[in-house]
């Protein structure tokens, strides 16, 4: 099984992206992040999604949950608001799947312990994730979601998709005990 197939198995929501070119760029970004970070795809299923508090939720599970929350919000808005709020579902999905991809460069494992890399101490994951995605040719709308999803994006106006992702991400972080 190739790296992309492994990524698809761990993050099956990638296949919900209808635009093939966008889907391939999302996979390329994950592939490059894994390579540069020295990870294998299966590592994201055991890597913690945060080092800020001791939770037993994997990076992969966090990304999947955030993505599913975003999709549920988009579907609910479409059903209830009947198109009054135009969302780009593929852009939202790509942003959700990639919002934390920079953590592949922010975290390392030494002797079974996960810790920040030197790079991760200097450049937080919204910035490294933006760089990874930009290098793979992701559109500006996805780059915007990655860049503004965390506190770094607070001073800026977010698109509707970026707002949904921002709150979905914090819904999957703030309530967790640590």
Per-region residue spans from a language model:
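Acidic/His-rich, divalent-metal-binding segments that scaffold phosphate/diphosphate chemistry
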Residues: 1-112
């Amino acid at each position: 099984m190739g790296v992309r197939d492994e990524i698809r198995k761990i993050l099956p929501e990638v296949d919900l992206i209808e635009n093939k070119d966008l889907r391939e760029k999302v996979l390329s970004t994950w592939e490059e992040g894994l390579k540069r970070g020295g990870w294998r795809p299966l590592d994201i299923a055991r890597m913690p999604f945060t080092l800020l508090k001791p939770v037993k939720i994997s990076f992969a599970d966090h990304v999947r949950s955030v993505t599913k929350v975003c999709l549920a919000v988009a579907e609910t808005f479409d059903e209830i608001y009947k198109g009054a709020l135009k969302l780009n579902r593929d852009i939202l999905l790509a942003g959700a799947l990639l919002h934390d991809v920079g953590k592949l460069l922010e975290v390392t494992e030494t002797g079974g312990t996960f810790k920040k890399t030197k790079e991760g101490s200097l450049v937080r994951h919204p910035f490294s994730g933006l760089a990874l995605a930009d290098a793979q040719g992701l559109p500006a709308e996805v780059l915007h979601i990655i860049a503004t999803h965390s506190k770094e994006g607070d001073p800026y106006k977010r698109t509707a998709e970026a707002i949904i992702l921002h709150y979905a991400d914090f819904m999957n972080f703030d309530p967790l005990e640590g």
